[in-house]
């Protein structure tokens, strides 16, 4: 189990936003690894560019061991996704992301299929991770599938281009435009991996957002579950206030230093607690001896 903290800033969705004022950047993204300890402290920063034929995606990684920030040009396309145990590619985060340039795209049409939807049971704080994560697949008693109209979009790898997936079929919700499922085919044309986006409707915002993203590897029976928050004290906070200043490479170093200070303070508190409890235990032993 890997715990992550992710921040998004999407300036193109702000009222009155105009593409010419976005500096060709539509999404700012930070992913910070909180646990386990062997991975904790690594921070990924991405500036997602609008027109990647003009300027490629920009990415940086903060390494807590080296305490330095470096460029990360490989955070794209079919390079392994961070903290995924090689079960997804970089462009599979949020179901699909990044430049479409390696594929030819075709709008096949509209059809009705069963898709993950209204996943409120999977989102419930009454449910534990162990209730959801089962061998080979998630607990289907908690998942919900509904018959919905979706747009079917096919992407086929261009001649001369390289990618782990030779073809993808995306199923895009007619109402929300959220990608709900993807079939990913290997270089031999065989179905290789299947993605699902289990969504809920935040009526108060309003928006539709995934509460769980899954990627199933049919070649080995393993799967990746991303976005679980059932046991966390806080779920998605759509009211967070950000600016581009929060998403600069220099901010990664400050964030890393802050985490190290918090970690040191946590160790000091733990040592004080251990010393206190050791004293209590000694006192009890002494009292027992007297008795």
Predicted feature locations:
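Arg/Gly-rich low-complexity intrinsically disordered repeat tracts
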Residues: 290-291
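A broadly tuned "polar low-complexity/structure-edge" signature
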Residues: 41-46, 107-108, 264
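Mature hydrolase/peptidase catalytic cores and their serpin-fold inhibitory cores, especially
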Residues: 100-166, 249-261
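Short, solvent-exposed polar/charged micro-motifs at secondary-structure junctions
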Residues: 1-2, 82, 115-117
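Gly/Pro-enriched, hydrophobic low-complexity segments
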Residues: 30-39, 44-100, 136-240
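Secretory-pathway-linked proteins and extracytosolic
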Residues: 221-265, 284
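A cross-taxon signal for low-complexity, glycine/charged-rich
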Residues: 266, 271-275, 282-287
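N-terminal leader/targeting segments and the immediate start of mature chains
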Residues: 1-30
């Amino acid at each position: 189990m890997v715990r992550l903290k992710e921040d998004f800033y999407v300036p193109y969705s702000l009222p009155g936003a105009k593409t010419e004022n976005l500096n060709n950047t539509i999404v700012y993204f930070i992913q910070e690894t909180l646990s386990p300890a062997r991975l904790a402290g690594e921070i990924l920063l991405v500036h997602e560019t609008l027109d990647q034929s003009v300027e490629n995606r920009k990415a940086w990684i903060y390494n807590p061991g080296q305490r330095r920030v470096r460029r990360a040009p490989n955070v794209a396309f079919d390079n392994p996704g961070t903290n995924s145990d090689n079960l997804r590619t970089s462009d599979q985060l949020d179901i699909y992301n990044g430049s479409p340039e390696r594929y030819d795209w075709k709008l096949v049409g509209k059809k009705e299929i069963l898709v993950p939807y209204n996943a409120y049971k999977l989102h419930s704080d009454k449910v534990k991770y162990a209730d959801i994560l089962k061998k080979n697949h998630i607990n289907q008693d908690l998942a919900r599938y509904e018959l919905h109209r979706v747009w079917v979009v096919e992407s086929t790898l261009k001649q001369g281009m390289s990618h782990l997936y030779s073809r993808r079929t995306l199923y895009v919700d007619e109402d929300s435009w959220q990608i709900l499922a993807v079939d990913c085919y290997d270089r031999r044309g065989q179905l290789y991996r299947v993605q699902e986006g289990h969504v809920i409707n935040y009526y108060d915002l309003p928006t539709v957002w995934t509460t769980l993203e899954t990627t199933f590897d049919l070649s080995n029976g393993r799967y990746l579950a991303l976005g679980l928050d059932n046991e966390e004290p806080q779920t998605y906070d759509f009211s967070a206030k950000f600016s581009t200043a929060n998403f600069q490479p220099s901010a990664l170093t400050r964030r890393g230093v802050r985490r190290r200070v918090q970690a040191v303070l946590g160790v000091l508190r733990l040592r004080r607690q251990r010393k206190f409890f050791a004293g209590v235990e000694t006192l009890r032993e002494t009292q027992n001896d007297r008795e």
